Amino acid sequence: MINNLSVSMTKVLKIILTIIIILFNTLSILANTTTLSSIKITKGNCTQIPIAINFFSAKSNEEHDLSQNIVSIISNDLNISKIFAPISSDLFIETEQGVAHIPLFTAWSQINANILINGEITKIDSTDFKVTFVIWDVFSAKEITRKSFTFPSQLWRSTAHKIADQIYKHVTGSKGNFNTKIVYVSESNSSNRKIRRIAIMDQDGANHNYITNGKNHVITPVFSPKNNQILYVSYHNKIPTVRIHDLNSGNNKILASFNGITFSPRFSPDGNKILVSNSSTKNVTHIYEINLLTGKIKQLTKGQSINTSPSYSPDGSKIAFVSDRSGSTQIYIMNDQGGNIKRLTSQPGAYTTPAWSPTNNYIAFTKIEAGEFSIGVIKLDGSNKRIIATKYLVEGPSWAPDGKTIIFSRAYKATKSTSTKVKLYSVDYTGYNEREIQTPENASDPNWSNEYE
């Protein structure tokens, strides 16, 4: 009997000792773990952050419906980023909503949430609402930040995108691209011709509309730095002209008309100048700067080669462009006066459509080699060149405001049963997280706006 008791006590002591060791190790891990709110996230990471977006508290039916719509947009934004993994509301344990209480963090930990979003919506007058939201770090049981936005009812989608941007920024330390727009060329077929119209939409495909009527051939639309104008090339009677469309007033006017073929217009970062390419002589193309304040036109490139596709650096002091001056089509960099020209890329292959990243560390490009097209990025010193998108005809890269995401178009060959399809895709500059951006019709020549206020 004594021996049995001794054995039992020994087992109990072993169990107690094991529990003590587990608790000690757990506390040690917790003491040396950095909270989520201070982790720097990169899009190349495969592990997504589980996030619970609670329904925002609301009193009236109108506020309740708005709450559901806003939470749905926030969840969709964060989900497509592939950084976050929104948790289904069916799994939520805590039922209390709003921003006035401290969450029951154990309940959120039970469903493996690392980040919790609580909020409330209040109607403040006949047209306006106020939304307040709090970002909680469930792991550390601490508030990361809280903010409020006042908005008219028609801007609820934009407000939801703003909240998603704030969540992305405060958790990852990087800018989000959710409250942005995309302009592109939409192409459809009529009975006897292709109809090309400039279209604009939110980054998630919502609020889609056309800003040209399809009567004239249009190419290469770009946003102004303040997002209030679209610059593009329109062909009237087969003559190309650079036009500018005011998104606020709807006014549309010719900005510049040269002899020969004019294409590839680009705004300067301050919006006061534009660059265009013009070919008035056979096999010779030059880059011109147009001062929008004075109307003065300045030729930046010289010689008897093709110089085209200019792209300003973020500070406007340098310009990336394409030239065949070395015998093959390569990307060069010059200063904003046309001097100090340096070659960036080298063979094999031809390099076109340079796009300078807003963070000033990479230039995106289209590469053509042996009939194959690809999208890539390269550092400003010519190092770290890598291909991030391929398949048939990919072209026209444009950077999102975060300097990490690139949009481009991809054409699919026609088959016996299908016509040629041209679609828009976005991809991280590391080559991760490629996704299709839905458009009603064929789409090409995309350009990403800056962040909307």
Swiss-Prot record:
Query: Which Cys pairs does UniProt list as disulfide-bonded?
Result: none
- What does UniProt give as GO cellular component? periplasmic space
User: Which keywords are on file for this protein?
Assistant: Cell cycle, Cell division, Periplasm, Signal
* Superkingdom of the source species: Bacteria
Q: Which InterPro entries match?
A: 6-blade_b-propeller_TolB-like (IPR011042), PD40 (IPR011659), Tol-Pal_TolB (IPR014167), TolB_N (IPR007195)
- Where can this protein be found? Periplasm
Main location group: periplasm
Signal sequence, renumbered to the chain:
1-31
Q: Which GO terms describe its biological process?
A: cell division; protein import
UniProt keyword Cell cycle, yes or no: yes
Please report a single Pfam family linked to this protein. Answer: PD40
Q: Which residues cross the membrane?
A: none
The family note in this entry says:
Belongs to the TolB family.
Concerning PANTHER family, the annotation shows: PROTEIN TOLB, PROTEIN TOLB HOMOLOG
Can you state the subunit structure given in the record? Answer: The Tol-Pal system is composed of five core proteins: the inner membrane proteins TolA, TolQ and TolR, the periplasmic protein TolB and the outer membrane protein Pal. They form a network linking the inner and outer membranes and the peptidoglycan layer.
Name the chain's protein: Tol-Pal system protein TolB
Q: Which organism is it from?
A: Orientia tsutsugamushi (strain Boryong)
